[in-house]
From Swiss-Prot:
Pathway: Pyrimidine metabolism; UMP biosynthesis via de novo pathway; (S)-dihydroorotate from bicarbonate: step 3/3
Catalyzed reaction equations: (S)-dihydroorotate + H2O = N-carbamoyl-L-aspartate + H(+)
Protein's name according to its UniProt entry: Dihydroorotase
Alphabetical keyword list: Hydrolase, Metal-binding, Pyrimidine biosynthesis, Zinc
Keyword Flavoprotein attached: no
Binding site for Zn(2+) 1: H62, H64, D154, D307
Gene: pyrC
Length: 426
């Protein structure tokens, strides 16, 4: 199959490209990229994309696909289809499944199911510890051999400091990273939302930013001591941003991510007890939100991820205390992130770097570019299209979103994976 994508604005930060160009796709690869591709074979399919923006396929390095074990929340198929709708061509799925992805059998199952679904690239993240209990290290070497791209107990922190040190050193020896969920469970115990004025007014137990900051500080010190690569997940606090910034200046091998809800929402969103605003870490204060936005602007935060955490209605339509944590984010992440461009915080090229180039680089996967010879993984964006968030139309089984009814600007109209159109807007 040969496809000529003609007349669109191509943005590829990996090549410092931003301009109107043609892309020729052949045998699943980028065959040519030029201001005007010359003669093409007769059997080439022509797609006129004038007015559209073509990006290297987005890479989400923090997704929860729920399968195996929680298929009532999401499946690898529904999650992959949601990713394609959102413009993501590669996703890294977290290990908090049932059973936990702490052994090669589960890793191989995920890869097998992803291959059967044949939608987007799926990269399994395996657990740091057996059953993510934080007691005994998982078999990193065996998991890497099976296809694990990184290690994380995400959803839970590794509270044991010596275990975390060993995990960093073990992963480093295998050229893999640890993705750390930074939370001191002793400080967050019993909390339901961010500790502050709003939690006091609502009468809900609070989780202080200190619960995040203490573990960020510990993990940065462990990474500095060991020389290993550390990636800090879903950064939400001003203290965490500040410490990561300082650590980078000292040469610590640390990268960090945040999600759209931490730069678009504050704890004020919880005031009507909407359980779709319950997330871990919790939505923080206005000051924390501003610090996260500044961290994105100055490069302290390397990546924007979805932390896509789909849940069934029964997990959310309960009292706030009993509701599950998480937001379903694959189908809204890009449009929410485009608000950073509209606000002048990032250029479009800088945003693409944080949603494609950098995540691919951090995970060490061959994605995030439209260079000739690369896989033809492409996100086609209509930058001017406005749309209303309505989860009843989503491909994801998880309809849990605090953004219901929001009008957003910028819509993915087509997603290609290895030259195949895996999503096209009706």
């Amino acid at each position: 199959m040969k496809i000529l994508l003609k007349g669109g604005r191509v943005i590829d930060p990996a090549q410092n490209l931003d301009g109107q160009m043609d892309l020729l796709l052949e045998n699943g690869k980028i065959a040519a990229i030029a201001e005007a591709v010359g003669s093409v074979p007769e059997d080439t399919r022509l797609l006129d994309l004038k007015g559209m923006i073509l990006l290297p396929g987005l890479v989400d390095m923090h997704t929860h696909l729920r399968e195996p074990g929680y298929e009532y929340k999401e499946t690898i198929r529904s999650g992959s289809e949601a990713a394609a709708v959102g413009g993501f061509t590669s996703i890294a799925c977290m290990p908090n499944t049932l059973p936990v992805n702490d052994n090669r059998t589960v890793t191989e199952y995920i890869l097998k199911r992803a291959k059967e679904c044949d939608t987007v690239h799926v990269y399994p993240v395996a657990a740091v510890s057996r059953n993510s209990e934080g007691k005994i290290l998982a078999e990193f070497g065996d998991l890497k051999e099976a296809g694990a791209i990184a290690f994380s107990d995400d959803g839970k922190p590794v509270m044991n400091s010596i275990l975390m040190r060993r995990a960093l050193e073990y992963a480093s020896s295998l050229d893999r990273i640890i993705i750390s969920h930074c939370e001191d469970l002793n400080l967050s115990a019993g909390g339901l939302m961010n500790e502050g004025k709003i939690s006091t007014e609502l009468g809900l137990p609070g989780i202080p930013t200190l619960a995040e900051d203490v573990m960020v500080a510990r993990d940065l010190l462990l990474a500095e001591f060991s020389g290993a690569a550390l990636h800090i997940a879903h950064v939400s606090s001003a203290g965490a941003v500040r410490m990561i910034r300082d650590a980078k200046k000292r040469g610590v091998r640390v990268t960090a991510e945040t999600t759209p809800h931490y730069f678009t929402l504050t704890d004020e969103a919880v005031t009507n007890f909407n359980t779709n605003t319950k997330v871990s870490p919790p939505l923080r204060s206005r000051e924390d939100l501003q610090a996260v936005r500044e961290g994105l602007r100055d490069g302290t935060l390397d990546a924007i991820v979805t932390d896509h955490a789909p849940h069934a209605l029964t997990d959310k339509e309960v009292e706030f205390e009993y509701a599950a944590n998480g937001i379903s984010g694959l189908e809204t992440a890009l449009a929410l992130s485009l608000t950073l461009v509209d606000d002048g915080l990032l250029t479009l090229s800088e945003l693409v770097r944080k949603m494609s180039v950098n995540p691919a680089k951090i995970l060490n996967i061959p994605k995030g570019t439209l260079r000739p010879g690369a896989d033809a993984d492409i996100t086609v964006l209509n930058p001017g299209k406005t749309w209303v968030v309505d989860p009843s139309n989503w491909r994801s089984q998880g309809k849990n979103t605090p953004f219901f009814g929001w009008t957003l600007k910028g819509k993915v109209i087509m997603t290609l994976v290895q030259g195949r159109i895996v999503y096209q807007e009706d």
